[in-house]
C-alpha cells in the first residue's frame, strides 16, 4: 500500500487544501493520504479558528484517509521545529512513501539545493550570514542575502521570500537530517499567496477566508461570501458550528495571557521557548499597556521582531512551553534557543525517533492504514487517551502539554459560546 503524507493546518479546510489532497494522490499514485494536522494552536502563534476535531472531519470528508495530530510543541514552533517534528513522526510510522507539500516554486531540484546548503552550512555561507546579522538585519533577510551572494544566483535565494517555499525547504532539511526514505513531492501553489487578505476567484488563502469569517458585514453573512472558497462539506460544518464552537481568535485568550505575563519577570520570561532577552525586556516595559493579545503584538514588534515571532513567543508563555522542557529527554535534548541562529547553537535531537502518533479521525474504508502503522511504526499509535499507558516520561510530558492546550482552548469555547465543557478525554474520534 502506497501512502502519501501531508502536513497541514486546515485553518480552515478550503478549496486549495482539497486541490492539494487530490493532486498529492494523483501525482504520487498513492492509495491513501495521511494528514498530520496541527491541533488547536497553529504555527503563526495563534489558536485555530475552529476546533481540531471539526477541522479533521472536514479533511476526511475532503478525501484524507487518516488524520493525526501534530503535537502542540511542534505546531506552534518555528518553521524548523514545525517541520522537523512533523517529519520525525512520519518517518517513525514506517509506512509513508511520499511527503507532498505546496510550494510557490514547485521545483523540487531548486528546493533541494537550498535545503542542502542550509543543512550543511558551508563555512563561506555561514560567515556571510554572520556578517549580515551583525548589520542588524532580521534573520530571514540576512539569510536570503547570504544565500544570494553564496550561490551567485539572486533568483534562487528569492525562493526563500515565499512562506510555503521556506516551509518546504525545512521539510527537505528534516528528511535529510533523519536520512529518511520518504520521497518528497512539491505541488505548485495555485491562486492567492499565503498571506493575501483578499478573496480571489480560484483558491483564496486561509488568511483571507478567516478575515472574512471574522469580519462579516452582518453576522448572518459570515459564510455567504466564502461559501465558494470552501468545499461544500467544510462550509456546512463551519456554518452549523458557527457561534457554538467557532470562531476562536487570539484575543479570546487576552485575559489569560495578561495574567500569565503579570506572573513573570524579565528573567523568568527568558525561560520560555523563543523568548529572547530583548523581547522579555520589551514585554515587561510595555506590560502596563496590554489591552489585547493582537494589539500587544503590534506594540512589541520591531524591525527585528516580527508580529508572528512575538505572537509565537507569547503563546509559548501562555502554554508554559519552556526551553528546558525536554532538554534532558531524548529524542529532543534542546540546546539553546534557535530559529534565528546559525551553526551549532540549534535545537537538535539525539535520536531519529518521534514520541507518538495520535489519531484524530479516519475513514472506515481505510482502516488498513492503521494496521500498517501498528505493524511498522517505531512509536505508539494513540487512538484513545485512556489507553495511552506505559509511555516514557518525555512522551507523557509532551502528551500532557497537548491535553492542557486543548482543554484551555475548550475553556475559551465554553466561556465564549456558553456550551458545556468537554475535556480532551471525552472527545470522540472522527470516523466517517
Annotate each predicted stretch with a short phrase:
Residues 25, 56-60, 173, 210:
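Class I S-adenosyl-L-methionine
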Residues 49-53, 61, 76-84:
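Generic alpha-helical scaffold signal
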Residues 1-55:
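N-terminal catalytic cores of NTP/NDP-binding nucleotidyl/phosphoryl-transfer enzymes
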Residues 25-26, 60, 87, 91-92:
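Non-catalytic positions within long, well-ordered alpha-helices that form the structural scaffold/packing
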Residues 56-71:
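A glycine-rich helix N-cap at a beta->alpha junction
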Residues 69-432:
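Active-site cores that bind ATP or allylic diphosphates and position pyrophosphate for catalysis
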Residues 8, 42-43, 59, 73-74, ...:
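Short, contiguous strand/loop micro-motifs
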Residues 28-30, 64, 95-96:
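Short, high-confidence coil segments that cap the C-terminus of an alpha-helix
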Amino acid at each position: 500500500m502506497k501512502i502519501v503524507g501531508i502536513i497541514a493546518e486546515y485553518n480552515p479546510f478550503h478549496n486549495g487544501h482539497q486541490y492539494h489532497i487530490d493532486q498529492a494522490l494523483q501525482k504520487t499514485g498513492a492509495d491513501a493520504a495521511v494528514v498530520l494536522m496541527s491541533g488547536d494552536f497553529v504555527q503563526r502563534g495563534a489558536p485555530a479558528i475552529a476546533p481540531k476535531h471539526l477541522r479533521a472531519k472536514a479533511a476526511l470528508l475532503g478525501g484524507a484517509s487518516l488524520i493525526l495530530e501534530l503535537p502542540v510543541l511542534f505546531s506552534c514552533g518555528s518553521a524548523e521545529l514545525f517541520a522537523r517534528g512533523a517529519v520525525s513522526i512520519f518517518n517513525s510510522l514506517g509506512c509513508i512513501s511520499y511527503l507532498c507539500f505546496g510550494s510557490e516554486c514547485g521545483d523540487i531540484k531548486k528546493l533541494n539545493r537550498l535545503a542542502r546548503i542550509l543543512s550543511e552550512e558551508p563555512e563561506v555561507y555561514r560567515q556571510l550570514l554572520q556578517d549580515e546579522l551583525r548589520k542588524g538585519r532580521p534573520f530571514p533577510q540576512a539569510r536570503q542575502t547570504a544565500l544570494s551572494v553564496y550561490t551567485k544566483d539572486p533568483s534562487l535565494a528569492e525562493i526563500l521570500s515565499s512562506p510555503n517555499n521556506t516551509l518546504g525547504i525545512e521539510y527537505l532539511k528534516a528528511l535529510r537530517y533523519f536520512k529518511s526514505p520518504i520521497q518528497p513531492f512539491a505541488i505548485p501553489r495555485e491562486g492567492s499567496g499565503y498571506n493575501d487578505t483578499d478573496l480571489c476567484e480560484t483558491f483564496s488563502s486561509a488568511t483571507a477566508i478567516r478575515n472574512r469569517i471574522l469580519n462579516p458585514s452582518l453576522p448572518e453573512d459570515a459564510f455567504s461570501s466564502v461559501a465558494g472558497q470552501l468545499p461544500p462539506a467544510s462550509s456546512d460544518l463551519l456554518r452549523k458550528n458557527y457561534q457554538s464552537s467557532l470562531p476562536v481568535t487570539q484575543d479570546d485568550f487576552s485575559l489569560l495571557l495578561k495574567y500569565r505575563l503579570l506572573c513573570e519577570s524579565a528573567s523568568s520570561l527568558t525561560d520560555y521557548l523563543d523568548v529572547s532577552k530583548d523581547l522579555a525586556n520589551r514585554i515587561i516595559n510595555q506590560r502596563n499597556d496590554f489591552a489585547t493579545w493582537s494589539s500587544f503584538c503590534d506594540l512589541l514588534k520591531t524591525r527585528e521582531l516580527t508580529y508572528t515571532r512575538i505572537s509565537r513567543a507569547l503563546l509559548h508563555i501562555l502554554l508554559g512551553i519552556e526551553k528546558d522542557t525536554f532538554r534532558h529527554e531524548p529524542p529532543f535534548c534542546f540546546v539553546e534557543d534557535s530559529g534565528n541562529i546559525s551553526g551549532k547553537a540549534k535545537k537538535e535531537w539525539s535520536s531519529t525517533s518521534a514520541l507518538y502518533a495520535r489519531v484524530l479521525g479516519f475513514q472506515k474504508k481505510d482502516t488498513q492504514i492503521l494496521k500498517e502503522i501498528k505493524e511498522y511504526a517505531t512509536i505508539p499509535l494513540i487512538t484513545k487517551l485512556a489507553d495511552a499507558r506505559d509511555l516514557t516520561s518525555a512522551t507523557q510530558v509532551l502528551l500532557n502539554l497537548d491535553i492542557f492546550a486543548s482543554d484551555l482552548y475548550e475553556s475559551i469555547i465554553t466561556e465564549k459560546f456558553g456550551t458545556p465543557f468537554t475535556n480532551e478525554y471525552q472527545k470522540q474520534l472522527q470516523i466517517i
